[in-house]
Amino acid sequence: MKKKNVVVFGGGTGLSVLLRGLKTFPVSITAIVTVADDGGSSGRLRKELDIPPPGDVRNVLVALSEVEPLLEQLFQHRFENGNGLSGHSLGNLLLAGMTSITGDFARGISEMSKVLNVRGKVLPASNRSIILHGEMEDGTIVTGESSIPKAGKKIKRVFLTPKDTKPLREGLEAIRKADVIVIGPGSLYTSVLPNLLVPGICEAIKQSTARKVYICNVMTQNGETDGYTASDHLQAIMDHCGVGIVDDILVHGEPISDTVKAKYAKEKAEPVIVDEHKLKALGVGTISDYFVLEQDDVLRHNASKVSEAILEGKPRTSSSIQ
């Protein structure tokens, strides 16, 4: 039986968690990773070396790598002191070095993938740095991925500059050949949408015959999705990309423990309400189950259970967009 081709879009911790589960299945993975990050070590390297931010890519490489734990630990090591080194992750520096050697960010990732024995392919959403801007409901424009959630305003839309940003040809080819396309999980406006907004990506996904699944976040995110239901998350993606971008939405449809809710409430986050009637009205199928793991009062998607549901390929509901 031929391996399924799975293309996954995202960034941040959520994507890495999913990929660790997905790589245990007999699938061919292409991860397309956001390059809008402008904070921390990534932001500094981006500014000083004029390269796309390596942090999200680093986490994805580690998630898909098959190396000794010590090498993984080394790649993720963050310096705590040292003039100029403090705060930097060794993996970010190695990716910056490989980009310098090869003269190309995507090629640098490809070479680093060999070093880390990566299972699958890791591609940046674009081969150049992109700047994410948020237009707020009151009309103000906030520039920079890390600044948008701090603005304390309701987000109307996000957009990228430069406007002539291009996707990688390899990425478009992977979308064309995909059997399953997965969007998320991750911060809606600052991890998920920056990938989709690279010109040509939304169109390629909509034209693809693959099953398109959006993995909805389990909790809202302060400064980004306050008060959002599952349909609000999906509506935001459709507002930016149009109809036909998602066939099925995967949601955690069970209650969350009071202790976990209390911990997240301190960060002004609350469980995302699954409003199935509105999801149906948007024309998508709903995959609902107990999809999370609670560890130390922190929620993470149960990667193997989520992967199984995505790959199951059960028939789309009659209401889904074809």
Swiss-Prot record:
Pfam families: CofD (PF01933)
The keyword NAD is annotated on this UniProt entry: yes
Keywords assigned by UniProt, alphabetized: Cytoplasm, NAD
CDD domains named in the record: CofD_YvcK (cd07044)
Primary subcellular site in the record, as a coarse category: cytoplasm
Molecular function terms, GO-annotated: LPPG:FO 2-phospho-L-lactate transferase activity
Any GO BP: regulation of cell shape
GO CC field: cytoplasm
Domain of life: Bacteria
UniProt: NAD(+) binding residues: T13, N217, V218, M219, K263, Y264, A265, K266, E267, R300, H301
Subcellular location: Cytoplasm
HAMAP family recorded: Gluconeogen_factor (MF_00973)
Function: Required for morphogenesis under gluconeogenic growth conditions.
Protein family per UniProt: Belongs to the gluconeogenesis factor family.
Protein name: Gluconeogenesis factor
Species of origin: Halalkalibacterium halodurans (strain ATCC BAA-125 / DSM 18197 / FERM 7344 / JCM 9153 / C-125)
Phylogenetic lineage: Bacteria, Bacillati, Bacillota, Bacilli, Bacillales
